[in-house]
Amino acid sequence: MSHGKVIAVDNPIIYKALTSSGPVVVDFFATWCGPCRAVAPKVGELSEKYSNVRFIQVDVDKVRSVAHEMNIRAMPTFVLYKDGQPLEKRVVGGNVRELEEMIKSISA
């Protein structure tokens, strides 16, 4: 279901490696989630626009341990990382405008 330069992650170890440095956007989604499917092409466009930011996608049903560890309660949920640390604020739902504003804050 990934679009653009979004990396699908299905392993907790790879997740840890990909979020350990730099600016990262993590899209927690589920294949059965309508809003997730609707927003995926827009996230793909953002991944092309912000090429200095790593975009990864985590299927909460396949990588339950990461979803649990990150306390994901709704999909889609976007968690942004800067220098290996998750930002406290998250984007829950398909608000692409809010997501892009947060991406700008980590990509500078």
Swiss-Prot record:
Belongs to the thioredoxin family. This is Thioredoxin Asp f 28. PANTHER family: THIOREDOXIN-LIKE PROTEIN 1 (PTHR46115). It holds the Pfam family Thioredoxin. Coiled coil: none annotated. InterPro entries: Thioredoxin-like_sf, Thioredoxin_CS, Thioredoxin_domain. The record marks 27 as: Deprotonates C-terminal active site Cys.
